[in-house]
Amino acid sequence: MKTATAVINRRALRHNLQRIRQLAPGSQIVAVVKANAYGHGMIESAHTFCDADCYGVARLSEALALRAAGITKPIVLLEGFFSADDLPLLVEHQLETAVHSLEQLAALEQATLPQPIRVWMKLDTGMHRLGVLPEHADAFWQRLTECRNVVQPVNIMSHFCRADEPEAGTTERQLACFDAFTQGKPGAQSIAASGGILLWPQAHRDRVRPGIILYGVSPLDNEDAAHFGFQPAMTFTSHLIAVREHKAGETVGYGGTWTSPRDTRLGVVAVGYGDGYPRCAPAGTPVLINGREVPLSGRVSMDMITVDLGPDAQDKVGDEVILWGPTLSVERIAAHTGASAYELITRLTQRTALEYVDGE
């Protein structure tokens, strides 16, 4: 009997990439596969996204793993390089990099490299995490244009902080800042990630950087990805390992936090926070068994959860349990837990098996 398994639908991944092509037809697509492709398996997902124009990762180790797996298309380090010692590896493996700090700029200026590196100057338009502040940006850009180790022209990128909140006004201000700086500069531009792709077509520019929507999950709190024509690629499943009679008034699990209001049948599912299921999931969080939703009862344990099957349940040991997937969206589970869908899909542990299918 299988226990915790994440079944990844390659057909859904390909569909989602094509959907982004439809939404941003004039832009190259940077398929963001960082954090193990948001829990979907970086190498397998990258090969499935073979029609993408390039790939985006957070760490040099991720880029090197892609190259070792035979990925030959451009790869950009979205956080940039972390040490001057990384620069020879960027040259050797033909990697592009964000440049967002004076330390990185100085490292590029001082390095002796066999050939220049393609860079993306990161402008801080309002995220205030990484990037060159607007008041220092012209001088920074000028130094990059004069650096012998930088492929010309210099490309420019930024990142939205509230693209999923169109009423906030923040994205308009960030775009205005970005446009003011990039005006007249010859390099490629990139500012839109998932939220920007969905809600801000004027931000698509030369490259878009889809992350979570590639995997069929929405970056928005109030809309599932299906609303925009995307298909969830992950189905997180396990199986019932016990079905038990349970009396009214009896508690379940650590701390006795849930008490049954009736005589019922409980199902014990072989999944827990040791597999990546959220420990914070409260009683009432739904799972899907034999086509119907049943609620979590009691606390999530390391290896198991307990669900209230109902007094007349006919479910049996070995029946499949869907924790989230196309028929029970991860966005709904996130709403129950207070965590984000990003967190849920990326927190799956090594104990959870990844399986790949080419399904409907």
UniProtKB/Swiss-Prot annotation:
Keyword Isomerase tagged: yes
Disulfide bonds: none
Role: Catalyzes the interconversion of L-alanine and D-alanine. May also act on other amino acids.
Annotated residues for binding of substrate: 129, 302
EC class (word): isomerase
GO MF, one annotated term: pyridoxal phosphate binding
Domain of life of the source: Bacteria
Species of the source: Pectobacterium atrosepticum (strain SCRI 1043 / ATCC BAA-672)
Entry's family note: Belongs to the alanine racemase family.
Annotated PROSITE patterns: ALANINE_RACEMASE
Pathway named in the protein's UniProt entry: Amino-acid biosynthesis; D-alanine biosynthesis; D-alanine from L-alanine: step 1/1
GO cellular component assignments: cytosol
Cytoplasm keyword on record: no
PANTHER family, per database record: ALANINE RACEMASE, ALANINE RACEMASE, BIOSYNTHETIC
Cofactor field: pyridoxal 5'-phosphate
GO biological process: D-alanine biosynthetic process
Reactions the enzyme catalyzes: L-alanine = D-alanine
The protein's name: Alanine racemase
UniProt xrefs under NCBIfam families: alr
